[in-house]
Amino acid sequence: MTRKKTNPFVAHHLLAKIEKVNMKEEKETIVTWSRASSILPAMVGHTIAIHNGKEHIPIYITNPMVGRKLGEFVPTRHFTSYESARKDTKSRR
């Protein structure tokens, strides 16, 4: 039994904002919390500020990004290195 491919998910409010900006033909930053939305060809050339849990990170959408999710381009975790702790223990010896 063959399966039908589903359409990519895009939040309705984000799609409406993209269409409105495309009609105006102005470049403005679009703010969104929808990290699960897929990137469509209509979004190419726009700057979208994507929420990472703390703040909005502006990302410029290019052609190779089409088909991927918005959340893939904004990291949510910050890695802290333990190098300074290791250097302190070596100096005490």
UniProtKB/Swiss-Prot annotation:
Pfam family, one: Ribosomal_S19
SUPFAM superfamilies in the cross-refs: Ribosomal protein S19
The gene coding this protein: rps19-A
The protein's name in its UniProt record: Small ribosomal subunit protein uS19c
Protein's cellular compartments: Plastid, Chloroplast
Gene3D superfamilies in the record: 30s Ribosomal Protein S19, Chain A
Single Gene Ontology MF annotation: rRNA binding
Organism: Oryza sativa subsp. indica (Rice)
GO cellular component, one term: chloroplast
Biological role stated in the UniProt entry: Protein S19 forms a complex with S13 that binds strongly to the 16S ribosomal RNA.
UniProt record, GO biological process: ribosomal small subunit assembly; translation
Family of this protein: Belongs to the universal ribosomal protein uS19 family.
Record-linked PANTHER family: RIBOSOMAL PROTEIN S19P FAMILY MEMBER, SMALL RIBOSOMAL SUBUNIT PROTEIN US19M
Main location (coarse class): plastid
Domain of life: Eukaryota
Keywords: Chloroplast, Plastid, Ribonucleoprotein, Ribosomal protein, RNA-binding, rRNA-binding
